[in-house]
């Protein structure tokens, strides 16, 4: 109970204390919602920026002044002081004309280096300092002239570049290509032992990821050391790479970086397939040849029965002559109907105007209705 009473007493004492009022600090300046300049107090002097032309730079010393300044320093060691004294003695013994030349050279260096040592003050009156010169940008204005706005567009330059490329290849075709004739070799057809036909893809003048691809084709029947059973097994091992319509196995490889590697891989793969086809353990005779991967295209040819023979040509010519003779007889008898004359006579007789549609006034109020009950277009003869 004692602890509870003490806690209650402390709580009542805290609540009975008067509330302290906090002294808020009033800002001396009025705050602005948006400002682009720093806040300044009235009466405080603003430091003025010195003009660039009034800035003074330290003039470089000549050797005599530099050595005398060094000798007046107390921080030199004995061996350093001896070295500076010898150098100062040597400078005093130098002829006056050399000293004047040295002074002239120092003056020229000072005048040339003065703009480089001048402090570049930013122009705060411009937006983003866009009028300032970029000191890091080095340009060579020798030989440059003003742009007269008379140049062609980039599309025209591209067309000219394309024309130059065509002319370059034309010069190569005229002057360099004929020189390759001395490297020409006569064509020698492949022998019966060369059954593999390799095909390569080359992009002249550029590197292309597809130029590594190598394609090989061969006919199983060209492998004379395989029997018919082994040849059929080789076709079944090739799977969808076998074309039953052309009787050719076609394979390709582009997994390696160079063409020689892909060609070597295809050669090793064909050797493994031939070795598997020669394996007498399983000849695959109980497995039919699957050709579902190939779509057979039926080539429709013109029937030989429909070809015109010499006898048929004579029969058609005789039938045409008979038809012409019959037409000539009808013309003489006046029984041949000429379609152009019939149409002309019909138009001249005026019978066509008699069949024109004439609107008949029908309906209520004496109005002609375009359609519906009582408003149909009727035909009548005049």
From Swiss-Prot:
A molecular function (GO) held by this record is: structural constituent of ribosome
What InterPro entries does the record tag this protein with? Ribosomal_mS35 (IPR017081), Ribosomal_mS35_mit (IPR019349), Ribosomal_mS35_mt (IPR039848)
> Main localisation, per the record?
mitochondrion
**Where does this polypeptide localize?**
Mitochondrion
Q: Which UniProt keywords apply?
A: Mitochondrion, Ribonucleoprotein, Ribosomal protein
Q: Which GO terms describe its cellular component?
A: mitochondrial small ribosomal subunit
Segments carrying the region annotation (Disordered) are: 363-382
Gly residues: which segments have biased composition?
A: 363-375
Its GO biological process terms?
Answer: mitochondrial translation
The UniProt function text for this chain reads: Component of the mitochondrial ribosome (mitoribosome), a dedicated translation machinery responsible for the synthesis of mitochondrial genome-encoded proteins, including at least some of the essential transmembrane subunits of the mitochondrial respiratory chain. The mitoribosomes are attached to the mitochondrial inner membrane and translation products are cotranslationally integrated into the membrane.
Complex and partners:
Component of the mitochondrial small ribosomal subunit (mt-SSU). Mature N.crassa 74S mitochondrial ribosomes consist of a small (37S) and a large (54S) subunit. The 37S small subunit contains a 16S ribosomal RNA (16S mt-rRNA) and 32 different proteins. The 54S large subunit contains a 23S rRNA (23S mt-rRNA) and 42 different proteins.
Please give the family membership noted in the entry. Belongs to the mitochondrion-specific ribosomal protein mS35 family.
Q: What is the protein name for this chain?
A: Small ribosomal subunit protein mS35
Q: Which organism is it from?
A: Neurospora crassa (strain ATCC 24698 / 74-OR23-1A / CBS 708.71 / DSM 1257 / FGSC 987)
